[in-house]
């Protein structure tokens, strides 16, 4: 699984990193985005809806922030 570490970066940087790197994984695979900017909590799911990518789940990270899991749809 591809992990994108965007901890410490402010939005829209985590979204830009996701948009650039999701192409590195095959369709059907999952990418994890680690982010601690509160805006990412709404921006990542919104990006998935806009780009027709599957938002699988999110989990809180022990150090703060979230791990967002997105399945590449196309």
Place the predicted regions along the sequence by residue:
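C-terminal structural segments of small proteins and small subunits
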Residues: 44-74
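Amphipathic, hydrophobic secondary-structure cores in small proteins
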Residues: 9-55
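Conserved beta-strand segments of alpha/beta enzyme cores
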Residues: 2-3, 54
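Intrinsic-disorder/low-complexity, polar/charged segments enriched in Ser/Thr/Lys/Arg/Asp/Glu/Gln
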Residues: 1, 28-32, 65-67
